[in-house]
């Protein structure tokens, strides 16, 4: 059910996100995701967790390369061994710091994934670091607690703005070359919930 929701939710969010009248689109399927995730978790368990960073890299590759904006596809060129190195160092330091370094580990992985993502000839850059992430997470947590949950919506919006603010594009994008794909135009009038539930129209 979680995998159905993750695929459906991404397809739905992408189909409802647009810029200059052109939509994003996620082309992944439930079947592909089930195979990838099931294999990844099984091998991670059998390897006592050492396969997990390789799975993360392969999942990022799948998730990114199945996403498009208009008629141009995003791409990912990360290296599994580099992800493993970041993960192993992060796990060791997380243990030594009683869990505090976990924010740096997550930030380092996220930054690596974004820095190895491209859209056409433009590359995405990330300035997300552990210290910033820890600070924003504490602010969100404290604000929600102090407002007894009432301020959760504000905190989430602040957190989203913070995260998106760490991303930028480096390179030229020819906006004239970006066009609505035929698949998007054909399905633009369909029910959005069909995307959420992974149902083909």
Feature locations, PLM:
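Membrane-interfacial and juxtamembrane segments of integral membrane proteins
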Residues: 1-201
């Amino acid at each position: 059910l979680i995998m159905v929701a993750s695929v459906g939710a991404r397809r739905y969010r992408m189909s409802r996100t647009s810029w200059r009248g052109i939509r994003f689109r996620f082309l992944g399927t439930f079947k592909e995701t089930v195979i990838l995730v099931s294999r990844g978790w099984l091998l991670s368990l059998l390897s006592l967790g050492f396969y997990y960073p390789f799975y993360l890299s392969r999942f990022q590759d799948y998730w990114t390369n199945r996403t498009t904006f208009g008629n141009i596809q995003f791409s990912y060129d990360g290296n599994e061994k580099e992800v493993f190195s970041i993960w192993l160092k992060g796990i060791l330091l997380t243990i030594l710091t009683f869990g505090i370094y976990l924010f740096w580990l997550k930030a380092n992985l996220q930054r690596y994934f974004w820095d190895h993502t491209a859209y056409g000839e433009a590359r995405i850059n990330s300035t997300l670091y552990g210290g910033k992430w820890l600070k924003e997470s504490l602010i969100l947590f404290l604000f929600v607690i102090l407002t007894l949950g009432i301020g959760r919506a504000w905190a989430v919006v602040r957190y989203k703005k913070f995260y998106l603010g760490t991303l930028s594009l480096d390179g030229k994008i020819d906006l004239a070359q970006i066009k609505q794909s035929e698949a998007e135009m054909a399905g633009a009038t369909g029910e959005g919930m069909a995307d959420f539930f992974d149902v083909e129209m």
